[in-house]
């Protein structure tokens, strides 16, 4: 009796565990030929699995004691040769054997660089749609072609090296034999010098395109020709659709008792992932932000505050790129309203209103950034960026003064103006006449820096004077200043000026050239670039021949 009891118990245990162990032992759920009969059997599960080429197929498998939990593995159909990705612990057994991915090697283990070759990721055969069929590495020659040293056999103590596009044998103590390049680089010898150059990065492994795709009810995602496509779940076709052919990219459906071809649903491709600022290293005072999908370095809010020094118990706040405000740390005046002409002041007795004319001038203890000026606004010292001076409606150029300069043997140049008072219009530069010199570049630079302030003040006096005599005097003083600067830098000019000072002045020259120069040279200046016409040999000869006339005009 006891033996019969033990035999019955062993038989029950075998029936319970038979779906889990063995390949086809126990109850064979794979004998079911339809989805209905499989789902009607409680010991069976109807599960879909995907092949490497994107084919989705349903299998009736035995349930196990783990309720078919996730257990990723690979299996190969011995009848068709297809490789399926099995995502469940309930696996098909009939005509299936376990399959191990061939991707057991890496680029590091192949050691392609040591052989002067590159590592390249190639597709598995026949497809690489799942994790069971990933890309595998292999060694290839440079740029995907054969290596020229593959067929070269060097004698002992030598090795093959590609130099100038040709394979040659070099001794081990020379060339790239002892060069150890970092990972991702290989050694090349160019003109007798060795250097490490980077390899092409391997292509990224394939991504499961169906992972983030959502198909309508009754459809499942499949990768067809590299595109994620929603295909109707596998089920017996309708009787009317049997033998009804549809073109590629569509399938048969029965609508109002008639078979029709319906286009397969293709979900829209998601937008590419945005570039992030994690790998961007901006300089100090700059932050990274995404502009038009690209990481861009812009000035951070703290850049201006780093250059601002606020009063005690005040903190800096960047309002815009042109305004920086210093506000109290304990801003109790935030909700305190004051009448016009007064501002809130937070003292020891609390916030109260003070007239603006008696309000503490905190700008005296506030340091603003460069090109910013402090102004009290609503009781807070505020740094405001100074606006550039407004140019006048017309600025003179050398095109207007060159004829007058040439008449007295001089050339015209543009010099910067002294626009310190931004409340009035000011031209950034203005034309003046100087003596030509063989060292024109240094003379122009020296003259421009010397007469910038003097000329701007002189032209202002000419404008206010409004007479021909005043304009003539100002032009003469500008010319004298230019002569003295040119004389200090040019020996020939010094000799010319000393010779001119010993001769008597000519009233005829004094009454013609300077007056015409003053009438054609307005006080304002031009923002155009300085004249490109430098001194020439003709101008130099004219200057030496008319030195007495220019000296008379100057006096």
Curated annotation (Swiss-Prot):
One of its GO terms (biological process) is sporulation resulting in formation of a cellular spore. Disulfide bonds: none annotated. InterPro entries: Dict_spore_N, Fol_N, Spore_Coat_Assembly. Glycans are attached at residues 103, 306, 418. The keyword Glycoprotein applies. Coiled coil: none annotated. Residues 27-144 form the DSCP-N domain. Residues 1-22 form the signal peptide. GO terms for cellular component: spore wall. It is found in: Spore wall. Residues 454-555 are annotated as: Disordered. Residues 148-170, 175-197, 209-231, 240-262, 276-298, 304-327, 332-354, 362-384 form the Follistatin-like domain. Induction: By exogenous cAMP, repressed by DIF. Residues 470-555 have a biased composition (Low complexity). Keywords: Glycoprotein, Repeat, Signal, Sporulation. Pfam families: Dicty_spore_N. This is Prespore protein Dp87. It comes from Dictyostelium discoideum.
